[in-house]
Amino acid sequence: EIGSGLVGSEMCIRDSGPEIAVYAGDYLFIAVFRLMSEHSLELSNLTKNIGSIERLLGGELGQLNHHFNLQQTLDDYIENISGKTGELFALSASVAPLISKNNTLTKRAYKIGMNIGISFQIMDDYLDYASTAQTLGKPVLEDIKQGIYSAPVLFALQENNALVSELIKNEKFDEVYDFIKTSDALEKTKALAKSYTLSALNLIDKLPKGKNRELIAEITRKLLERTL
């Protein structure tokens, strides 16, 4: 996080500099690999977990590769957030059934987590433009200033590519923000998030009936309505 305005949060990059922040992140990944090797009962499970982390990093690198790219498509965006956020949720959701050797449940849980993660990230990007800095606890427009064009920006570009591109190139970010707020970009972004939430809920409905299924469904629905 290069942005320095997160409220009430200590940040490694701000307190110790970018080099230590990067090395600290690398160290944490090594620690994760070590813990997985100690607790994974089968090599296949360890391989799947490492594959998820590989895809997670690939999503982050994909996003970096599209910095300041006004030709980025929604498909590019979905591919990147599927790695950087969707994969994290998918891995978290599928670890328990993976250990229990329930292949059918593992695959379903993975898909549920992926859809929830994608919806979560889209909503995060939606709130960057639909909320205020005070509500979010962090500066708005931080991503677009860093060349990260999320769903609201991409929908705005679809609506008026010439105008929005020109505003971005001239760093008139407040005007981009105003355009997004008055266009259909936010409505389309929310609809996109909802589509992934509904996909997750359809898969959740196929889980064994009971209190746990209802709880998972309730949490999934609430994520779509969050304001933070």
Region locations from a protein language model:
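Active-site flanking loop/helix segments enriched in acidic
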Residues: 10, 14-17, 63-83, 135-137, ...
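Multi-pass membrane catalytic core of lipid/isoprenoid biosynthesis enzymes
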Residues: 17-34, 38, 143-159
